[in-house]
Amino acid sequence: MGVGGSRLDNVSAGGLACPILPDGRLKERAMNIRSQWMTRHPDGAVFADIKIPSYDKVLAAVDRAHRAVPHFRIVGWDFCIDEHGDPVFIEYNGAPAMNQVSCGPLFGDLTEPVLNTIFLNEAEFTN
C-alpha cells in the first residue's frame, strides 16, 4: 500500500506490504523495504482494524483474470477498489517478489508439490 499520498504501492517504492486474511481483513503488522514491522500505517490507520471492501469481488476478478493468462502458473495480481466498491485491475506480475518476507511461506504444506510443478524437471531434458 502507498504511503504519504503516493499512488505507488510497491515496497521498493516506499510502500508497505501487509498480509491479507482469507476474509479480507489485514493482519496486524505490515513491513517496509527495510523489513521493519509496524502495526499502524504512517497516516495513522491501524492495520488490524482494516477490512478490504468488496474483497469477494476482488477474489472473483483475480480468478477470472488468472484463467485468461494460462501461460503463467504464479502471478502477483494488483487490484484497487474504486469509489463504488468495484475492483479495478492495475497490473499483473509474472515474477512476484517479497510475498514470503511479509506473509510467510506462500504455499505452506503444498510448497514441494508446487515447486515440482513450477520448475522444469531437469531429468526430462538430459535423457
Question: Language-model features: where?
Answer:
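Hydrophobic residue at the +6 position relative to the catalytic HRD Asp in the kinase catalytic loop
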Residues: 77-79
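C-terminal active-site "lid" helix and adjoining low-complexity regulatory extension at the edge
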Residues: 39-60, 67-72, 81-127
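ATP-dependent carboxylate/phosphate-activation module, predominantly the ATP-grasp catalytic core
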Residues: 1-60
